[in-house]
């Protein structure tokens, strides 16, 4: 009987630990915690605004997600993020949103959200989407159409491309963090500040230094799309 009770207790502790471990953002300990962006306090996240000063406007954002964005750039895409940085009411709620506009043949380059899973819905057009796993780097990709949904697991390198040569495309993503973060792979490698040593990149990519220099020149203006 004692051993059964001990096993049950151990199982409950493992379950509790597992539930805590899989939480991407800390769980809220109150009804809401609107971020106080003016507070000098620095914590893992943002401190709460005095709840007595919270209004309905703290839970509203005129994001204009129905409006097309400018995609006139090198990659032909534009990501509009709605997260705790520009929507403090999302603090501790573990969710954020993004609208992605694609020019004809536009690409949302390979990137990572280190703190979130992404659920993408195609609103207009046809996209080629995919993600790559950790080593040995298996690719999962699919052509998705208007109304289709595709999920990118947390911290996996992923991308999207508009397959239409003439028409723009639009998608909307829900992310499982108030502040997912983004690391655009090419920009991080070839446009970091300070730059990564050429010796490292020449050896890593097995190319000549002039190729590395050319690649770095493409990201010298902090084009972190």
From Swiss-Prot:
Belongs to the germin family. GO terms for molecular function: manganese ion binding. Residues 60-213 form the Cupin type-1 domain. This is Germin-like protein 8-3. GO terms for cellular component: apoplast. Residues 1-23 form the signal peptide. It is found in: Secreted, Extracellular space, Apoplast. Member of the 12 germin-like protein gene cluster located on chromosome 8 in the major-effect quantitative trait loci (QTL) for fungal blast resistance. Partial suppression of the 12 germin-like protein genes increases susceptibility to the fungal pathogens causing rice blast and sheath blight diseases. Plays a role in broad-spectrum disease resistance. Probably has no oxalate oxidase activity even if the active site is conserved. Pfam families: Cupin_1. Mn(2+) binds at residues 111, 113, 118, 158. Disulfide bonds join 33-48. Transmembrane segments: none annotated. The keyword Oxidoreductase does not apply. Oligomer (believed to be a pentamer but probably hexamer). Keywords: Apoplast, Disulfide bond, Glycoprotein, Manganese, Metal-binding, Secreted, Signal. Glycans are attached at residues 53, 78. The keyword Signal applies.
């Amino acid at each position: 009987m004692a051993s059964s009770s001990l096993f049950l207790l151990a199982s409950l502790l493992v379950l509790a630990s597992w539930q805590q471990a899989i939480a991407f953002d800390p769980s809220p300990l109150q009804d809401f915690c609107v971020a106080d962006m003016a507070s000098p306090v620095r914590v893992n996240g943002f401190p709460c605004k005095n709840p007595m000063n919270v209004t309905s406007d703290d839970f509203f954002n005129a994001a204009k997600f129905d409006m097309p964005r400018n995609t006139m750039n090198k990659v032909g895409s534009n990501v509009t993020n709605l997260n705790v940085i520009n929507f403090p009411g999302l603090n501790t709620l573990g969710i954020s949103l993004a609208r992605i506009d694609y020019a004809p043949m536009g690409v949302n380059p390979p990137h990572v959200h280190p703190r979130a899973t992404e659920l993408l819905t195609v609103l207009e057009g046809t996209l080629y989407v995919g993600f790559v796993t950790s080593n040995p780097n298996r690719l999962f990709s699919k052509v998705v159409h208007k109304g289709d949904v595709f999920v990118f697991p947390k911290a996996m390198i992923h991308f999207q491309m508009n397959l239409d040569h003439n028409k723009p495309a639009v998608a909307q993503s829900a992310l499982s963090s108030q502040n997912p973060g983004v690391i655009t792979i090419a920009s991080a490698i070839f446009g970091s500040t300070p730059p990564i040593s050429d010796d490292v990149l020449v050896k890593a990519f097995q190319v000549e230094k002039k190729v590395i220099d050319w690649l770095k020149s493409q990201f010298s203006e902090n084009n972190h799309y």
